[in-house]
Amino acid sequence: MNAFALTAIVGTICISAVAPARAQFSDDRIKIGVLSDIAGIYSDINGEGAAVAARLAAEDMGNAVAGKPIEIIVADHQNKPDIAASIARKWIDTEQVDVIADVPNSAAALAVQAITKERKRIFLMSGPGSVELTGKSCSPFGFMWTWDTHSVSAGTAQALIAKGDQSWFFVTADYAFGHSLEDEASKAVKALGGTVKGGVRHPLGSSDFSSFLLRAQSSGAKVVALANAGGDTINAVKQANEFGIPQGGQTLTGLLLNINDIHALTLQVAQGLTLSNSFYWDMNDETRAWSARFEAKTGRKPSMNQAGVYSAVRHYLHAVKQIGTDDPEKAAAQIRATPVNDMMMKGARIGQNGRVFGDMYLFEVKKPSESKRPWDYFKLVRTIPGAEAYIAEKDSGCGLVK
């Protein structure tokens, strides 16, 4: 399948209305492209669910802003940066897409960030994790919504080292995201007085982790940290249990775990794992109500990435409604100027580097006996304020920060 054919994977919502005379929107519509992993290792935590989340945000606006219809299209980047870049260029140059959203896979997101920066299009990220996206590769038009490799690793490292797990070994996905996750976790471990005993890197989409896990097992490290995500994490955790790594006294931790991963693993396998997330469906009445809407359309609870797509698209739509135009520079300024307030975040500030400083939550996976209903998987250990969870703007390396 070539890159242009991928745009055939399209879901569209389009409802017409009469526009106020003052509103100025290009092509008399707002067109949002959800660029995701539709069939690969991140499809459960992003994928079609990300498109559903974007549509829920559009529904909240009545599927129109200032009388202009909201159109949402979807494409699969197959976790390949060149395909992601090709789709982004085609969307912007020939299909008049105003916003690109989602883009799990940091290498793909870095490619899209460069294109949206050059073409002056809004880029709403809820899936990639590399801190470079709000660091040296930041953009005036790029916003990183849900988490990053620092926020998911620092809280987990702090919790485990406080329990006495001082020495670490990393099993890392060999691409931009995995490298960033290992790097940020290593910094956190060392800053807290721990040590890194080594690491090994595996190809994206690995099915056999035996050689990598044997090296981790023989390292003697107290913690075997999985610096990967999605299907890679699921496969690694399952095989680590088969090898007896947790049973042998080593602590197994996934530095990026989503509720979908726990669902796939089952509580019997995942119980006791520690993880940092920015969203959990069962936090309060608002999250439960929104998650019920999502589940009605998908048959499952949302991941934090899918919730983040909803939050980001909703925030963008409110921003352009407020200013009466989808002009990218004006929209970007309004996005930054307005704190995020929705079912996911309350009063979250957006930095000059595009980082959304929402709270993170440290969770522990429940034992099977503690779970009372479907998807009842997490126990809240600690709330980590956004200002603490993320790298400070001044230290991010972003040239936009004054």
Each predicted region: which residue ranges?
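Extracytosolic ligand-binding ectodomains
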Residues: 21-402
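Bacterial N-terminal signal peptides
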Residues: 5-17
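N-terminal secretory signal peptides that target proteins for export/translocation
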Residues: 1-2
